[in-house]
A protein has these predicted regions:
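Extracytoplasmic/periplasmic proteins that interact with beta-lactams or build/remodel peptidoglycan
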Residues: 1-20, 124, 128, 132, ...
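Active-site-adjacent helix/loop patches that line small-molecule binding or acyl-intermediate pockets
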Residues: 1, 25-26, 89-94, 105-149, ...
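Conserved catalytic neighborhood of penicillin-recognizing serine enzymes
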Residues: 33, 83-138, 202-235, 241-242
Length: 519
């Protein structure tokens, strides 16, 4: 009966999407504890007049994963203590070896907490996180979790692995989410030091034998670790229950019902694939919407096209209790309220949070600095221009210039560093400016214009003082000055170059870059 109901729901949704020339959809429902497939809808019904690849089994067809793998990276980094749930991650214009990720919204927050980056499915922070974690390790983790479609070595995918640079199947993805849930559930079935059974990580099954579904007398070989720990999984699934999704993942308040669901969407480049996967302690529901032909369509996103179908399927399933918190491998610690990192003695606002045990080893707050100011905190000073007994040692939350530039536009309470008092000569200030493009040490291509003429690179700089004048020099030649919007066209030859920027206060920034060729 469930199979018939889900088939009808899938066909009804596709019928509504047909007006946008979206002709295919697929859905899976499986039991989390056993992996048994309860419903399998490989495609929508064929139209009477024409076929749109309706005979293709989409569930086993490799498709670009979009953002659907981001929860596994978040969990892995929690597991290793590389981040805490609310650790700030950069969200700024980024180019890494020619790879330039963009957020769905096309804008930047400057810095955003890791959990909010996952909830909002921000691409730029995800790339920074993967760079920190290393894509080679993530490639290995995904294979360990059951992703069979990674047929190329890690370098083939690089950092794009987190943004849909690899293909996955709905079958594998559903199995991986189910394995997360199963690991969390079975953690409590094995009291003692060793609580993990590697056999909990397995693909979905069409048929589950009675011994598997009801348990067996055979004692599993237990270990004290797994690809992902129960604590990291628990924290990740809780983050994925967030209902309000700004930006790409918006408008789901009306699904805030009695059922608690951890869910994630994904959208591939070119709007070719819409994914939605949800997991509870009882069920995993995985949905794909798109065209079997690979044709992209406007509005073909995981949020708009796939998630409504997933929630309609969940409406046919029973609810239940949520996953238990694995307190045995978690610690309660204090963190800086602003950076999300372990607090130091100069963090003036702290929160108490539960973290994975290795979170105790994570970096302490790197954003709070002690600066020397006047008593009213309006100006920075130092010992050569202010008597020591009149200098106030002040704790200040300081973002790097590029992050600050974007962060300030969305966080009105952010306090930029106070300027130095005019009588204070600045000899070694905190970094005042930062080059957004080209990045230090980067290697860039400069394309030719459509008319064949030599193209130009547009340099971009941000400064803490919005009204300052900056003077630009390339390889010792003065190029000109900028004020407020620090963008400057340059036309360098192929080879290595030195770019020097000097502001009106004498602060200097020197960066090296290389032009590889003119395309």
């Amino acid at each position: 009966a469930l199979q018939i109901r889900v088939e009808q729901i899938v066909n009804d949704h596709q019928h509504r999407l047909k007006g946008n020339r979206i002709f295919n959809a697929a859905a899976l429902v499986a039991d989390v504890r056993t992996g048994e497939v309860l419903t399998y809808v490989g495609n929508t019904d064929r139209d009477k007049d024409e076929s749109h690849g309706n005979d293709v089994d989409i569930i086993t067809a490799p498709r670009s994963t979009g953002s659907i793998l981001k929860p596994f990276l978040y969990a892995a980094m929690l597991d290793e203590g590389k981040i805490l749930p609310k650790t700030l991650v950069p969200d700024i214009p980024t180019i890494i070896n020619g790879f330039s990720p963009k957020n769905f919204s096309k804008d930047y927050d400057g810095a955003v907490s890791a959990d909010k980056a996952l909830i909002r499915s921000l691409n730029v922070p995800a790339v920074h996180m993967l760079r920190n974690y290393r894509y080679e390790k993530f490639h290995s983790l995904l294979k360990g979790m059951g992703m069979t479609s990674l047929v190329f070595p890690p370098d083939h995918y690089g950092l794009s692995l987190i943004l849909g640079g690899a293909e996955g199947t709905l079958w594998d993805i559903a199995g991986m989410y189910a394995s997360m849930g199963r690991t969390s559930l079975n953690y409590f079935e094995h009291p003692g030091k060793n609580r993990y059974d590697r056999n909990d990580l397995h693909a979905l099954k069409y048929i589950v034998d009675q011994a598997t579904s009801k348990g067996t007398d055979a004692t599993p070989e237990l270990e004290n670790t797994s690809w992902l720990s129960a604590s990291a999984i628990y924290q990740t699934l809780n983050v994925l229950t967030e209902v309000y999704r700004p930006g790409e993942e918006s408008g789901w308040k009306h699904f805030d019902g009695a059922k608690k669901i951890a869910w994630k969407t994904g959208t591939s480049f070119g709007f070719r694939d819409g994914w939605a996967v949800g997991v509870t302690p009882s069920y995993v529901v995985a949905v794909w919407v798109g065209n079997a032909s690979g044709e992209g369509r406007p509005g073909l996103t995981g949020t708009d096209a796939a998630a409504p179908l997933m929630f309609d399927i969940f409406s046919q399933l029973e609810g239940g209790a949520w996953f238990q918190m694995p307190r045995m491998e978690m610690e309660q610690i204090t963190v800086c309220s602003l950076s999300g990192q372990r607090n130091t003695s100069i963090c003036d606002q702290v929160d108490t949070v539960w973290v994975s045990r290795r979170g105790m080893e994570s970096f302490p707050c790197s954003y709070h600095k002690i600066i020397h100011t006047t008593a009213d905190r309006k100006y920075r000073v130092h010992s050569e221009c202010q008597e020591i007994d009149k200098v106030a040692n002040t704790s200040w939350f300081v973002l790097p210039p590029t992050q600050e530039h974007f962060f300030r536009t969305k966080n009105q309470t952010y306090r930029p560093l106070p300027p130095y008092r005019k009588d204070c000569d600045v000899s070694s200030p905190l970094l005042s400016m930062d080059l957004v493009y080209p990045k230090p040490g980067s290697r860039i291509f400069i394309p030719r214009e459509l008319d064949g003429k030599s193209g130009r690179a547009v340099c971009e700089l941000v400064h803490r003082n919005p009204n300052v004048t900056v003077h630009w020099h390339l390889d010792g030649t003065y190029l000109g000055s900028t004020k407020k919007n620090h963008h400057l066209d340059i036309n360098p030859d192929e080879g290595r170059h030195v770019l020097i920027m000097v502001d009106e206060d004498g602060n200097t920034l020197e960066e090296h870059f290389e032009v590889l060729s003119r395309l």
